[in-house]
């Protein structure tokens, strides 16, 4: 079991903890598939809803909040039945807009894993307005059920009445609908190709600034992040922040980053290079490789 879970595992009922420990191996990064979840429910003799709430301390253990020191864990349950953990991330000494909220982390985890819809969000603190707006960008966002400890469950539409969302800006294919934009680039570099593929899968209906970041660690492992825009603009999730959240979930340190690539569209209304460099330089003493590509 990873050291970061030693304290949180003691907060779980013993039967659930005993069943969960084998899953918390060195490669565990917060994903539990539907079959594994069913086995946890059976072994613990708890309901699924009880298990999901009980797992929140495990999700919160993924957090890296050096500024607030407030650990938030979130669990997104997909239509597939799989669950995806996420946690808040803050960059020490940097402006707060670089922060990743736990719900954003969990949703990006699900998106990068190929999930097509979120049906439940379990979180240990009431979603802030920023996260409510971010969730509203998703497929059937208003119908996502929000579950909090010691509170009744409600739909997102309860927490965000009279919501402004993608349809108000004539966007009919919201976040998590698989969409692919093709770009022209002649490269044999696997890391650049990976970034190009993820840029094509990014979500930028408001600026067409399709973009992705890939980070590489010294052992050759890569961690990606895609741009995810929001109808309200400010809650958009930048690809570098998503990549850093991804890396952190996998229990890697920022000091292990040896290479960083940003690929973005030449036809976007904005460029993410400045914000991407700011975030990168806050955590690693390396230069960003910036590649601009043309849509096919």
From Swiss-Prot:
Keyword Metal-binding in record: yes
GO BP, sorted A to Z: cytidine deamination
Binding site for substrate: 88-90
Enzyme Commission code(s) on record: 3.5.4.5
Cofactors required: Zn(2+)
Residue positions of the active site: 103
Catalyzed chemical reaction(s): cytidine + H2O + H(+) = uridine + NH4(+); 2'-deoxycytidine + H2O + H(+) = 2'-deoxyuridine + NH4(+)
Taxonomy, superkingdom: Bacteria
Swiss-Prot/TrEMBL keywords: Hydrolase, Metal-binding, Zinc
Pfam family, one: dCMP_cyt_deam_1
GO MF assignments: cytidine deaminase activity; identical protein binding; zinc ion binding
GO cellular component, one term: cytosol
Cofactor descriptive note: Binds 1 zinc ion.
Subunit record text: Homodimer.
Protein name: Cytidine deaminase
Originating species: Shewanella sp. (strain ANA-3)
Gene expressing this chain: cdd
